[in-house]
């Protein structure tokens, strides 16, 4: 049985490095899908540089997505198409192989990969949620309890083909037909396994300049407004401990310890600009 770790990529080399170093000893292949257009439909270069990740060359299956439906002028259609393109990297998978689908910044805990039970159609890794910096944990604004994130999804290749159909539908199950709502509830209640202590969601962990680039290119164009989309505003809100996207979220700085990926802890000096 092999494990395929599948995710989309834009230009997040720091997070990609953390992900590869954290999971390389535990998965057989990384399937990386990168598109020639942003989610908002703008042309972009292919940013993945194999030379930076030469030590993982034998594990990486790279998919360049050059057929984005940008003519639809639909950011969500572009995002979904890029995620579906991960299927193109699974041609060598066998029915009993495991397939994980994530956003790049959702890193499953390597010690929890074997917690998934294939009698469930899907496993969902419940992950700790951090924003903007590796140790800037998101809190509920009312209770101040740490927020969790339903991130990485895992299934067998057989379930992926026979039940979900593709990697986008594994990520967000949207059946069709008159019974679609009942099917969603049935999956959630009886065929989805929540996997506790499931890793980390390092959302928007990048420099202010890259945050601005992401705002300009992402599907969530409601955030691309003048008060938010400037380097000055981004840096100011980071220093003040406020949410850059002006959402109702509180944060706390937590110690960088053994609860984090070992690679971040060991190389904290290299990541000093991404740590509080």
Residue locations for each model-derived region?
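Short His-Asn-centered micro-motif
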Residues: 5-10, 33-34, 101-104, 125-128
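C-terminal accessory extensions appended to soluble enzyme cores
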Residues: 190-276
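Catalytic phosphate/metal-binding cores of nucleic-acid and nucleotide-processing enzymes, i.e., regions
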Residues: 4-6, 18, 84-96, 116-124
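Conserved catalytic core of nucleotide-sugar-dependent glycosyltransferases
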Residues: 106-220, 224
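N-proximal low-complexity "stem/linker" segments adjacent to membrane-targeting elements
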Residues: 1-25, 266-269, 274-276
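Short, structured coil segments at secondary-structure junctions
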Residues: 26, 56-58, 118-119
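Active-site-proximal specificity loops/subdomain of glycosyltransferases
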Residues: 37-101, 109-113
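Short, well-formed alpha-helical segments that are part of the catalytic scaffolds
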Residues: 12-32, 39-48
